[in-house]
A protein has these predicted regions:
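Bacterial Sec-dependent N-terminal signal peptides
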Residues: 1-29
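Low-complexity, Ser/Thr/Pro/Gly-enriched N-terminal "stalk/linker" regions
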Residues: 28-114, 131-158
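C-terminal beta-rich recognition modules with glycine/proline-rich loops and embedded aromatic residues
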Residues: 30-32, 37-38, 42-46, 252, ...
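Solvent-exposed loop and edge beta-strand segments that line ligand/cofactor-binding
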Residues: 48-49, 100-115, 158-177, 210-229, ...
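Well-ordered alpha-helical scaffold segments within catalytic/enzyme domains
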Residues: 69-71, 75-77, 117-132, 176-191, ...
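Long, well-ordered core segments of solenoidal/helical folds
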Residues: 71-105, 137-154, 196-215, 250-270, ...
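Extended ligand-binding groove/face enriched in aromatic
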Residues: 104-108, 125-266
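Catalytic-core region of carbohydrate-active enzymes that cleave or remodel glycosidic bonds
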Residues: 298-322, 354-406
Length: 655
């Protein structure tokens, strides 16, 4: 295979050869704008530029991420990202020992996923931080893993004679190796030996999996329906985007044609709007299913087959409606799938207050859902995808993270034992490494990826965490912006354009669905037609120093629990403040799960008072009025249950 690396910076002659460029990115205004900037900034590494552009832009995308290094968060999320980066990716993560699974074999199924997940999150975090210490760590572990390449080109935990090791999860493990290496190659170092290893890994899969006499993909995997193996679709499509080798596109079509799992076709089911918990023939494993649909989005981006856009949009809508809880994650054990330990779709949106639930909301589910929402947002500009990301990151994602930054909870309850390390994984001399410990940092890395994005007509603001950002105008000129805010502690934000040449272009703001009466002004002049749950596009001649002021409608809302299979769910209510879910904390309140009657107005809202938190590390705490006096509630994410205390998010009513 010959790679064309000639790049003329500032033109569309980035020369991504072959099918991927022809089908995906050609003659796209959005591609042109970002590729021009990225190529100019990275002209010393044309291979990496080509890989970045190939994977990042498609003519079908409505939005694109800003170029790496173009956004810097400050405050709320930045502290958490740095905490995790310092204490996990640059801290306790045992890179050498998880790489040894490929050298010495594994003691249980799927352990080979660990290396791929570690490098995937690290590479995505490097995309944001350009941290030199992190780069050195990643370079060392990639160099190490390349010494494990087997004679058929595979990086696998089992010898060639035992591949594909179906019940051992060999294909799933190799999927994660490919995801890690494509991400590393794109954002960290586009070394030729890495590209060679990616191609070798992919080609070894193509040699083994396919139509008879090869092994059938849906017969691979540890689960009885093999759904996890079809998630190889995403990295194979990424490699197609990088290389243009049509064999990878053909293989991806084969994966889709096989339906995603045994005894069901999850793509047909999504097209038919089958509820997610009824998909996949009795094993609707949520994390793995999300991973497969991430690959389907990539396939659509390159082929433009509208059928598949309808398919993933149906899946997206049905997950929103049927599975996502108030903290932005989903999946549970009761009532449908107790044997899957809280890791399956379970009609969770309706069942979330069911007192019989013992395990729910695996962190892997939440992160894969967030990633899928990001893909949907990029491809369709569906503003609800950003709403659901916001819901998850402020509540479920941060709520799963250990206070010390050195890991994430496996599953996450709304009432009772909020967090646990109990689940699939391996203990390294007292350090529990689980799938969720490894996936959590990837979720953090996707926050800056989508916080501010680029349309063909100007920047798009999706999140209101304070930031500095560099984007492009409609004429492809640089514009620099600063968002000043204490959100969500405050309901006010101010966006200032700090550097630009005067020009007419569009600046687009997401108006959150929870903010029913948002006020927006430009240089003091009120803006009309501001609608909750929509994008607000401000098209005008912008000048340096222009300011956009935003006031959110941060009413505190009391919501009744949805009622699913268990009528006892009707006995609970929850409290939301803007995007933040509040909870009672046994660490500070011995009566944390006692029934209360909230004092609300006719619209179900109430006046709460911010107070100084009783515990260090609590982000937000409020006095909340009840019929028997005020109680304290804090944000769900801050409730620390790692030392055995409990949480109450669905509050029992006074009967």
């Amino acid at each position: 295979m010959k790679l064309n690396t000639k790049i003329a910076c500032g033109t569309l002659c980035v020369l991504i050869f072959g099918g991927a460029y022809q089908h995906g990115a050609a003659q796209n205004n959005l591609l042109f704008s970002q590729s021009k900037v990225y190529a100019a900034a990275n002209k010393e590494n044309p291979q990496q530029t080509r890989a970045y552009i190939a994977q990042t832009y498609s003519q079908r995308d409505k939005l694109a991420p800003l170029a790496p290094g173009s956004l810097k968060l400050t405050g709320y999320f930045e502290n958490d990202i740095q905490n995790s980066l310092t204490h996990w990716n640059k801290g306790v993560l045992p890179y050498a020992r998880i790489a040894d699974f490929f050298r010495n074999g594994r003691a249980q199924f799927a352990l080979g996923e660990m290396w791929g997940k570690a490098v995937l999150s690290g590479a995505m975090l490097y995309r944001y931080t350009h941290d030199p210490e992190l780069k050195t760590i990643l370079q060392a572990t990639v160099k190490d893993i390349l010494t494990t390449v087997r004679e058929n080109g595979s990086i696998s935990c089992v010898p060639v004679s035992e591949q594909p090791d179906g019940k051992g999860g060999d294909l799933w493990e190799r999927k994660y190796v490919l995801l890690a290496l494509t991400t590393y190659y794109t954002y960290v170092e586009a070394a030729p030996e890495v590209l060679k290893a990616m191609i070798g890994e992919a080609n070894s899969i193509l040699d083994q999996i396919g139509d008879a006499p090869k092994h059938d993909i849906i017969e691979q995997g540890w689960s009885w329906n093999g759904i996890e193996s079809s998630s190889v679709l995403e990295p194979i499509m990424r490699l197609y985007e990088i290389t243009g080798d049509k064999r990878y596109l053909d293989f991806s079509k084969y994966v889709i044609d096989r339906g995603g799992c045994r005894n069901a076709n999850i793509f047909t089911q999504a097209l038919q709007n089958v509820p997610p918990h009824e998909m996949a023939s009795g094993y609707p494993k949520a994390y793995e299913m999300n991973s497969v649909f991430n690959g389907l989005v990539e396939y659509y981006r390159m082929t433009g087959e509208e059928k598949w856009k309808t398919c993933f949009e149906n899946y997206f809508r049905n997950i929103k409606q049927n599975e996502i809880t108030i903290v932005g994650n989903g999946g549970a054990d009761e009532p449908y799938y107790p044997k899957w330990a809280g890791e399956a779709w379970d009609n969770t949106a309706k069942e979330q207050a069911n007192p019989k639930i013992k395990r729910m909301m695996e962190t892997c589910i939440g992160v894969s859902w967030m990633k899928f929402c990001t893909y949907v947002l990029r491809t369709t500009a569906d503003v609800s995808a950003a709403d659901y990301i916001e819901k998850y990151i402020y509540n479920g994602l941060l709520g799963a993270m250990k206070p010390g930054g050195d890991g994430f909870s496996y599953v996450n309850l709304l009432n009772g034992d909020k967090v646990t390390n109990q689940g699939w994984g391996w203990d390294f001399d007292g350090l529990p490494v689980t799938c969720c410990n490894l996936n959590g940092p990837t979720g953090l890395a996707y926050i800056p990826y989508m916080a501010v994005m680029q349309s063909g007509n100007g920047p798009v603001v999706n999140l209101y965490n304070s930031f500095t950002a560099k984007a492009l105008t409609a004429k492809k000129r640089n514009v620099e912006m600063v968002l000043k805010t204490e959100f969500p502690r405050s309901n006010k934000a101010e966006l200032e354009l700090t550097k630009l040449k005067s020009e007419k272009f569009s600046l687009t703001l997401r108006i959150p669905s929870w903010s029913k009466n948002t006020k927006v002004s430009v240089n003091g002049e009120p803006v009309k037609d501001v609608v909750a749950g929509k994008y607000l596009t401000l098209e005008r001649k912008w000048n340096k120093g222009d300011k956009i002021s935003i006031t959110f409608d941060m009413k505190c809302r009391v919501i009744d629990a949805p009622i699913g299979s268990n009528p006892e769910s009707a006995n609970f209510q929850a409290v939301e403040y803007g995007p933040i879910v509040l909870a009672r904390d046994e660490n500070t309140d011995a009566n944390y799960n006692a029934p209360v009657k909230f004092v609300t107005d006719d619209a179900g809202t109430m006046n709460i008072t911010p107070v100084k938190p009783l515990l260090a590390g609590t982000r937000m705490e409020f006095e909340v009025p009840t019929a028997n006096g005020k109680i304290r509630m804090s944000d769900y994410s801050s409730v620390n249950c790692w030392q055995g205390k409990k949480i109450c998010t669905w509050i029992p009513r006074v009967r």
